[in-house]
Curated annotation (Swiss-Prot):
Keywords, ordered alphabetically: Cleavage on pair of basic residues, Disulfide bond, Hormone, Secreted, Signal
Name of this protein: Bombyxin A-2 homolog
Statement: the UniProt record of this protein carries the keyword Protein biosynthesis: no
CDD domains linked to this entry: IlGF_insulin_bombyxin_like (cd04366)
Function: Brain peptide responsible for activation of prothoracic glands to produce ecdysone in insects.
Cellular component terms per the entry's GO annotation: extracellular space
Gene Ontology MF: a single term: hormone activity
Main location: secreted
Compartments where found: Secreted
Gene, per the UniProt record: SBXA2
Signal peptide: 1-18
Domain of life, source organism: Eukaryota
Cystine bridges: 26-85, 38-98, 84-89
Length: 100
């Protein structure tokens, strides 16, 4: 019951705002917004992976995880928390996480 009330409040707040301003969404609020924006179907957006386990690292004797840790050129993986909790994001950015 409490979750339903929270969900309803968030939905009404989003509908009332009507604009696409950026907001910070964290924790349960982020999950609730994803469910609302994505119509209950969302997925985790992941960067493409290298197909071969050690391809591209040049350190074939190291395990994949250790080689990835040593690879300084590799950028930080961005996810929904980085995009919407650590900094404000818009509904359009949230839509990028919806299942297509």
């Amino acid at each position: 019951m409490r979750t339903q009330v929270l969900f309803l409040i968030v939905v009404l707040a989003v509908m009332a705002s009507g604009d696409d301003t950026a907001h910070v969404y964290c924790g349960r609020r982020l999950a609730t917004m994803l469910l609302y924006v994505c119509d209950n179907q969302y997925q985790v957006k992941r960067p493409p992976y290298i197909s071969s386990e050690n391809e591209g690292y040049g350190w074939k004797w190291l395990e994949r995880q250790r080689a990835r840790q040593l690879d300084e050129a590799r950028g930080k993986r961005q996810g929904i928390v980085e995009e919407c909790c650590n900094k404000p994001c818009t509904e359009n950015e949230l839509l990028g996480y919806c299942y297509k």
